[in-house]
Amino acid sequence: MTRKTKRKGFIQTLDGNTLAMKLIASIIRLEDLIIFLEGKGRQVSYAKLSDKEGRTVADADACTDAVINSDSFINLGKGNHVRCSTIEAVETCNGQDHKGILIRGEGDAILSFLPISQLEAREKVAEALHDALVSYEAGKFVQPDLTKILSTH
């Protein structure tokens, strides 16, 4: 099913809501879920995927593609994306329980977390994300190849 847009810049999400695409700051894909967050980390759309028309994996992919094609999004892998313009900070987390990269938005809201167990890989991913944000700010966005970085560690 193709995502229907009633007006340019808007999208009908899998949960039936119509949202301005510029509102969506983060796309989180889990096994059978698709979640959209806005810049302050609040959930604006949540849908459980199934075989039902309008809620399939293909529908989620089409919805994701429509949103990420509307602006510059960093691809974090596994269907997760974050809008460049909403990223306020990229932090490495070296905690005992959680190790990875935290991406923060407005008011320190967590927009995404990328689990990475190895310190060297965390540092390289953080550097790649920083470089991507610098390229975005310069008007020449370059998508970081996080898959390549993570596959070598």
PLM region spans:
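Acidic, Ser/Thr- and proline-rich intrinsically disordered linker/docking segments
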Residues: T2-N17, K22-H81, S85-H153
